[in-house]
Structure formats: C-alpha cells, structure tokens
C-alpha cells in the first residue's frame, strides 16, 4: 500500500513540477507527435507458417494434426516424398504470422513480424520460421517472411518440476519480412492533407488549424487549414506547394495541446492514473472494511496401541472478524497535489481508492471522466 501511495504521490509531484518549471515545454507538442496523416496509416498482414528446429518443444502430431499436414505439404512442394510412417519428432510448430505494413513502404524494404503458436508447442525458442507469405485483407500477398525467431521468455523442465518465465509460445522475427508489393498510393496527386488527432479534442484541433494558417499566410499568402471536427483537420494544398515539403513543414509546427480531465482505473491490476486537470468538489468520505478470516486446522487422532481403532481426522475451525477504517476525511481537490494528499490521508489500499473514486463520481463531485478498464 505504501508503494502505491508513493507512486501516486510521485506522479503528482512530477506533474506539478513540470507545470511550474517548464510550462511551455509541458503544454506544447509538435503536430507529428499528436496527429497522423490519414493517408499514412498502417495495414495489417497475416499468414500461416511453420517453425522448425525446435528442441523437442514443438507440436505433437496427435494433438495438432494440422502441423503434420502442413509439414507434408511443404516437403511435397520441395520435391521430397512423404510416404512412410508417422514421425514423432516434436521439432516443428504451426504458427500464425502477423505484421503491420507501414505507409509508403516500397518493395525490398523489411518489416518485423510476430509469430504465435497454434498447436500444443511449449516453446518457440531456437526455432526458424520458414518461408511464409503474408496477405492483406484483400487477399493479395504483400510480403514474405523467414528467419530466426527471438523469444523473450524461457522454460526449464525436469522430471518433477517446471520453471517458466514470460511467454515462450510467441516471438518476433526482427526484419524478417521482405515487402514484395507496395500499396497503391495517391499521396502526390492529393489536393489536400487530412490530419487525424490521436486524442480527439476540439480545442487542440482549432489550435492546429490556427497554427497551420499562420504558417500558410506567411508562406503562401492565405489560410489553408480548417478543423473539420474534434479529430480531423483538413489542409488544402496551395497551388505552388510541393505536398511532401508542405507536410514536412506542417508536422514540425509547435502547437499547444489540451486534453479532457480523466481518471483511468484498471480494476484487475489496481492501477489508477489521475490526470493533472482532475478536480474534486468538497466532499466527505468515510471508508471502512470488514475482514473475516476462516482458518482450518484439522487434528489427527491416533488410536491406542493394539486397540484395533482407526486413525481419524477431527476438524477444527477458527473464525476471526476484524473491522478497520471508518475514518471520515474531507477531500477538496483544486489541483492534483491536493487531491492525492486527500486520498493518502484516508489510508486505504488501491481497491479502496477505486471504490472511493467511483463513489465520488456517483455523488457528482468528481469533475472528470471516469474510465474503467
């Protein structure tokens, strides 16, 4: 609990110190860091392949018959006869291969791929992905992947124990795919640029349009940008402008950003993230917990020697109840530092903080969006 409160306090102090020491740096960003070009989005690729060279950690052909079928088909394509008995070697694994095709990627360039086991393989460490075609949503092949697989986790197994750290059934092949086909792009023929904000906000969109118009008025003699909504800003191409150079100039412009106040809660991990703009109206909070502990300590009763009795187990149950908390605290958060200090004064665990924030939101005192994950 102390570690959690130290973490929350550290986040608060860091946010406040940045706001006091370097407000211009903390509140401004380049356009390229907060928005992306609509025509420059990634495209997902997928394929099915085999990983070979595993040290007995691959798929079992009984549990994963599709692995054997794929291996036989691959060998037949290589001109090798597959007639004969079934192999019991577990050095092959069937995997799904995924990758992201970046925008404006040209044939011959390389991209990273991710491999994930489909069968009952226990580890992909030490394996090699054999030639696998990667297709897009349109069914066209855009890249071919092959190479050594890198797995971050490891597994050690003995006769009576197994130690596993991380995920051993998924890995990456850095630069393992070569692009064979480029996506059709009409960027140079476009008449406008559409910027999409990664965090939609009307204030930020208006500021981007104003900054771009200021640059365009000085460079081309008139405004060219318009905020379409909270997420998109449309920039018309000036007649005498080169689109690539225009985008390079625009993406390096500095703009003041703005985001709505949010409190993000992950109930599974107990993580709480509080934005610097979160405010809490004066509210009284009381929090208490009732803990009931049930302990079973069965006793073994042995019979007297030569009495022909039987060993019996007599159950013994101890129940203890403890009620903690119950303090009443006044929380009034005009800034992040005061809000965190008020939560720390209550002295509850992270799950208690989550319940308190939900209660404050229900009472209408939390002036922020509460996001539950």
Swiss-Prot record:
It comes from the Bacteria. The keyword Signal applies. Its main location: periplasm. GO terms for biological process: bacterial-type flagellum-dependent cell motility. GO terms for molecular function: structural molecule activity. Keywords: Bacterial flagellum, Periplasm, Signal. It is found in: Periplasm; Bacterial flagellum basal body. GO terms for cellular component: bacterial-type flagellum basal body, distal rod, P ring; outer membrane-bounded periplasmic space. InterPro entries: Flag_FlgI. Residues 1-26 form the signal peptide. The keyword Lipid metabolism does not apply. Belongs to the FlgI family. Assembles around the rod to form the L-ring and probably protects the motor/basal body from shearing forces during rotation. The basal body constitutes a major portion of the flagellar organelle and consists of four rings (L,P,S, and M) mounted on a central rod. This is Flagellar P-ring protein.
